[in-house]
Design a protein with these regions (language model features):
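Small/aliphatic-rich secondary-structure junction motif
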Residues: 3-51, 73, 77
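Structural beta-alpha unit
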Residues: 72-106
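A short acidic, glycine-rich active-site loop
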Residues: 52-65
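Gly/Ser-rich helix-loop-strand patches that form or flank binding pockets
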Residues: 96-140
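Short glycine/serine/threonine/alanine-rich loop segments
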Residues: 31-32, 79, 103, 134
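Conserved beta-strand positions in the Rossmann-like core of class I SAM-dependent methyltransferases
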Residues: 34, 82, 137
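Histidine-centered beta-alpha loop that forms part of the nucleotide-sugar donor binding/catalytic region
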Residues: 10, 88, 110-113
Length: 140
């Protein structure tokens, strides 16, 4: 049924609950989960210089730090996952990655913080639900 699950996360408490739901589904259905972390603003020039302009590695490092709890859930349980990090509008990036990865289900928290500051059901979650081409599970 759901073999490819996309989990949009930002490390917030609601995102952690969404991660637990996604992990439970992945375990029960033997699904692969794509963890998606969206950064709204690119790293500063000084950070990019320090990272030798390896922006992808810098973004991945930031993401792993912010969503360590989520990654730990998947690694501890031995669940298959991939981490995708993008810069831009959270809703648009989540939808784009879901389409590219051919996700069967998107799991997202109802509100968050961090790079998704001020995410309320009326914004990112609603946009994702409205525009996604697959079912969306919003976790409170």
């Amino acid at each position: 049924m759901y073999t490819k699950i996309l989990l949009a996360t930002d490390g917030s408490e609601n995102a952690r609950r969404a991660a637990n739901e996604a992990a439970g589904l992945a375990r029960e259905l033997s699904s692969h989960v794509t963890l998606v972390y969206i950064i709204q603003h690119p790293p500063s020039q000084s950070r990019m210089v320090k990272a030798n302009f390896d922006v992808h590695s810098l973004l991945e490092e930031d993401a792993k730090s912010e969503i360590k709890h989520t990654i730990d859930i998947f690694e501890t349980e031995g669940l298959a996952y991939t981490l995708k990090v993008a810069i831009g509008d959270p809703a648009a990036e989540i939808i784009g990655i879901a389409e590219k990865e051919k996700a069967d289900l998107i799991v997202i928290g109802s509100r968050g913080f961090g790079t998704l500051k001020g995410v309320f059901l009326g914004s990112v979650s609603q946009k994702v639900t409205y525009h996604a081409k697959c079912p969306v599970m919003i976790v409170k």
